């Protein structure tokens, strides 16, 4: 591969922005050349702007320390420096929708970690192993925006990554009712225990907006493009409870499923461990070699042992067993800020590059 694509990170000083910067260090295709954040950070070096708020466990990459942070609101100026941007801005939903489209209108592709555009009908919301074909809706979005190369693409909520891939792998058995309870890490709120000491030894049985996202977003991912928009699927019915637990990284889900066709346990496991998608076929740089692993031990998956499976880009499943109320039950685990956030967005960008939607300006 020749010259790397120049990448900007919008909202680069926050937790997800930091995760983007960590993940993109030494990336074979992409190089972070521009970081944009709020006006109060603009004009400082990245190291000064972040100060003692670096939340990653690995050190800040040397290559970004002296990048001078730009004002994220100076759209034309930031856009002129990059081939595409990742968005992790912290604003209101309406502000995010506007600023992401403003960047797209400068002919700069936007790959967003935010939820603002997830239900914009012509914006693809993609898990690359599940619905890569949804990227085709970008052609309709460009007509609406009046662009030739600018668009917005998004990744779904972190909570669904522990069970949506499993249900996709079991599609031929026709899941029709799903009950899920998610146990979600504090990094999902952009926090560490240092920022949120009251979470130590505590559980909060509510995460604002999370249950609706967890119930509805999988249906959009399983939907189809019709008349230039994505029409969500109407089955299975999913009901969720989302609980904040005292864990730094990793979302666990306890899931019950009703299936129209009854497989054996061995068939269910076989479908998981052989499940592959376009990222695996293309060998994309961030793609896990095996997307879903099944663990036979009764006490797995565990955060401390399994959250970093496939560099945080894989899903770990365990405890598949028959159920007396539903048909089957299982426990899933995924890394909420890697696969569930920045890593998932990086994989989307790799897919978009492979599909020809992202290229050098």
Regions found by a protein language model. Give the residues of each.
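Charged docking surfaces used in two-component/phosphorelay signaling
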Residues: 187-361
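N-terminal Rossmann-like NAD(P) cofactor-binding subdomain of oxidoreductases
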Residues: 2-205, 237, 309, 316, ...
